[in-house]
């Protein structure tokens, strides 16, 4: 009888331990986070100054819905009611602005490239924003757009109506290139768009692969034509022309779709080379969209779960973890992994491709106070990489950074 009681106690302890383990595993810290916090801001009302950065922790690339015009530092504003595209962004603040950006936008009915004409009305009621996943219904095109990123790649899922459907790729102005490869359902290109702090050879190479053959191909280019009275540039799509290199380029591909038909786009980019962009695309592997969402959620739960808080209200939990999420975005990874899985980076200081780590997009006059001590205490393995990157910055430029984005921006203080 005493042996039975002893075994019973053991089983009870095991059940309790299992329940505790399951409770801990089931905690979704990422679901406390709202990436939309701080987005109700403007040049005149400089408060918050955030955008929904859909990414992995410290990811090389972020993705965001774009409500502002090309080049606008306030690229997503909560009070806006139209989305112009879904943009790869590296912007640390609206004042520093962006670099290496390009955008993707689904449209229906007829191909439209100009950002005002391709834009679609949306409602926050039909918008879901998580750190690892974004979904919105584009009412004017009747298209549901979803995206889930890895550190250097992203998968889009478009749910189209029965219509002539298109996807616009805008490589932005100030020097860009696009090439449509119909036989591979692929678009490749590069953007040189930046706001300073880059060498003369700076490029962000991108590759976009679709899982549906094209029935329409066109490209766009201009060489700084005179602007219209409304500030826009005349747009003429060149059907059948598959390649453009100019001041501002883009591409539009299309296909016939049935009601509810799903089309995926796999996207990656590299600051090193087109070949490295294809290598970075392998981050998606053979995973389905749903598996990538789960992996992204797990990555954020692991990072956010380093800090456990107790005793607050639900709103306080949401505030805390939304702020912690912002603390785990920058400085971002500016390195990539070579064919052997080793870190290598394009140097934003001397334009060379070099071995080792590099992080960027941080202003030391702010971040030296709290962010770096916090990372050193809570995320020492990440902070070790950041410090190695700082040493590489000194080796490649002769200085530690004051404001890096991606290279020296020569503003503010804080490097000594």
Explain the meaning of each model-derived region:
Residues 27-372, 376-416:
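Accessory carbohydrate-recognition regions in carbohydrate-active enzymes
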Residues 1-11:
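Short, small-residue-biased leader/transition segments that mark boundaries at the very start
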Residues 9-27:
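Bacterial Sec-dependent N-terminal signal peptides
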Residues 1-3, 18, 54, 122:
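Intrinsically disordered, low-complexity segments enriched in Ser/Pro/Gly/Ala and basic residues
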């Amino acid at each position: 009888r005493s042996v039975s009681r002893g075994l019973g106690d053991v089983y009870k302890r095991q059940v309790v331990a299992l329940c505790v383990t399951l409770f801990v595993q089931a905690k979704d810290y990422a679901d406390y986070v709202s990436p939309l916090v701080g987005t109700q801001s403007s040049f005149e009302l400089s408060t918050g100054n955030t955008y929904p950065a859909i990414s992995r922790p410290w990811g090389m690339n972020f993705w965001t819905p774009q409500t502002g015009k090309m080049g606008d530092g306030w690229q997503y504003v909560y009070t806006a009611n139209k989305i112009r595209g879904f943009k790869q962004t590296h912007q640390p603040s609206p004042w520093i602005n962006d670099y290496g950006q390009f955008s993707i936008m689904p449209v229906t009915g007829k191909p439209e490239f100009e950002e005002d004409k391709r834009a679609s009305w949306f409602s926050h009621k039909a918008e879901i924003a998580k750190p690892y996943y974004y979904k919105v219904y584009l009412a004017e095109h009747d298209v549901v757009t979803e995206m889930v990123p890895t550190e250097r790649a992203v998968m889009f899922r478009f749910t189209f109506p029965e219509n002539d459907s298109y996807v616009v790729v805008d490589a932005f102005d100030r020097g860009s290139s696009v090439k449509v490869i119909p036989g591979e359902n692929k678009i490749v290109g590069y953007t040189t768009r930046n706001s300073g702090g880059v060498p003369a050879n700076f490029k962000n190479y991108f590759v976009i692969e679709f899982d549906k053959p094209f029935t329409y191909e066109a490209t766009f280019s201009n060489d700084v034509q005179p602007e219209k009275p409304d500030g826009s540039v005349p747009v003429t799509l060149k059907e059948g022309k598959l390649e453009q290199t100019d001041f501002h380029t883009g591409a539009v591909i299309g296909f016939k779709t049935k009601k509810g038909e799903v089309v995926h786009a796999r996207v990656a980019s590299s600051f090193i080379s087109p070949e490295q962009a294809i290598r970075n695309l392998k981050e998606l592997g053979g995973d389905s969209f749903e598996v990538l969402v789960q992996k992204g959620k797990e990555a954020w739960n692991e990072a956010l779960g380093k800090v456990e808080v107790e005793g607050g209200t639900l709103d306080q939990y949401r505030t805390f973890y939304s702020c912690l999420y912002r603390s785990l975005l920058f400085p971002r990874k500016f390195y990539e992994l070579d064919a052997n899985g080793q870190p290598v980076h394009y140097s934003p200081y001397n334009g060379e491709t070099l071995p080792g780590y590099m992080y960027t997009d941080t202003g030391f006059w702010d971040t030296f106070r709290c962010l770096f001590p916090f990372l050193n205490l809570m995320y020492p393995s990440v902070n070790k990489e950041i410090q190695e990157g700082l040493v590489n910055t000194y080796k490649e430029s002769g200085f530690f950074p004051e404001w890096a984005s991606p290279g020296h921006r020569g503003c503010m203080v804080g490097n000594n």
